[in-house]
Amino acid sequence: MNERQTGGEGEIVLRKVFEGDLPIFFEQQQDKAANYLAAFIYRDPYDRQAFNNHWHKIFVNPTVVNRTILYNGQVAGYLGKFEIEGQPEITYWLGKNYWGKGIATGALTEFMKELEERPIYARAAKDNFGSIRVLQKCGFQITGYDRGFANARGQEIEEAILQLG
């Protein structure tokens, strides 16, 4: 399960998410600019108990697949596959310090090799050009748009719906 790939000047490794990764994920999700771009975040990203409860539900859900992204041995973020109404969907988060190095693209490329389900979907705020570009580099295509309430922005916004396969 430890998939390896290079990203920029470093090594990308995917591994199982450990409980010890959660404080790093929580810290990464405190960045206001990152939350704005992600848009569809927890109601209160600063509520550690809500964050821990959310991850506990993830850990016990057999349909969820999670991987921690390591970059040069450091926890850079995570990837996940979950289901909404029986449809597989992926999500990912990368700490801001790791943006712009090809890490998200490299990690998602490896993750998609592990997941055999197709079609598989992803969503991103329509103005999150970086995330949409990562998804497109990994073969996802925009199939439409939807609107949803973005907690990070306090309003309804448009989101791109992407599909692979």
Predicted regions located by residue number:
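Acyl-donor (CoA/ACP) binding surface of acyl/acetyltransferases
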Residues: 1-23, 27-32, 36, 66-165
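Juxtamembrane/interface motifs at transmembrane-helix termini
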Residues: 44-47, 56-57, 97-98, 127-128
